[in-house]
Amino acid sequence: MDKFKILKDVQDSLDKDSQRTKKPRKIGITMVLIADVGNYGPKYIEPFQELIDRIKLLDLFWHHDMNVIEKALDAYRKMGIDVAPGGTHFEIAKAQGRIDEYISFLKDFGFNEVEIENHGGVSTMEEMKDEVKLFKDKGFQVVGELGRKWWWRDPTRVSRDLISVERTVEQALQLIEAGADYIYWEGMIVRALIGPQLENRKGQKQLIEVANSIDPNKIIFELWEDRNQPNHPLFAWLIRQFGPNVNLANIMAWDVKDLEWIRHGIIYEMDHPYYRWSKDKSLGPCWWKIEAPDYDIDLQRNYALKDSF
């Protein structure tokens, strides 16, 4: 008798009720950002490799033994994971006039994906489209990045916390038309539009409008926490809006399991919606569409005691 049968059966039922996709996925993607391959490399993610579809291997510099990079890449690819260096490396290569060497490096090491971004603001849209085509012609899967980290020179934004929906959609569609397989929507924009405390109602409306204008199989929402702000509420907000198979990127390796729990509605975010829906399915067609609490109850905005209910 398989003593793990009950766990497998429960897991299968959770996947079914959440309509969760399996690898190789075209939607429901989780991309993991590796900024420390020595401590959070292949061995760390191996136990839950089925949850990870792509890796952004940011950590390419300042290693005592540079072979760690090639070994990690080989291990990731054997797990069925697409691997790209960070868009940072593309911008460095471009700034130093070394794109041809960069392409050779990617091929020699076995990267199968590249990210085209323009945080330095030195490229026109036409140049970005040409770069997408160049890397596609070289046999890479290509992801184009939408927007920039800082709003002051980002043509898709009108302020730190709001965008031009029209210009954002236009940029995304141009990158897709040029051949980009996916679009990463810059994480600082996604965070600003949702609001670190889920407070930016106008920005949320804009984010939904953009998402509804782009093929959901193409757009991947980046999230990152470089300012040490929590990501879990933002994961939950995106899953509530777009379902468990929303594409998410820049997930830290230690957050992958928590994200998967949120994708299945079995954690505190949104007040354990799967439990509530399982008990009373008249609440909605699926657990992520049922009523959720007002996050003012939980998130610490100028924390003070609240009146009792």
Regions found by a protein language model. Give the residues of each.
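Conserved N-terminal beta1-alpha1 strand-loop-helix module at the mouth
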Residues: 2-73
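Generic structural signal for hydrophobic
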Residues: 44-48, 76, 105-109, 135, ...
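A structural motif
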Residues: 52, 111, 177-181, 216, ...
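Catalytic cores of alpha/beta
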Residues: 97-104, 166-176, 227-242
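Active-site mouth loops of central-metabolism enzymes
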Residues: 25-40, 58-63, 84-98, 121, ...
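Active-site-adjacent beta->alpha loops and helix N-cap segments on the catalytic face
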Residues: 14, 18, 40, 62-76, ...
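Hydrophobic faces of well-ordered beta-strands that scaffold small-molecule active sites
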Residues: 27-35, 53-57, 83-87, 114-116, ...
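C-terminal alpha-helical cap/extension of soluble enzyme domains
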Residues: 3-19, 211-309
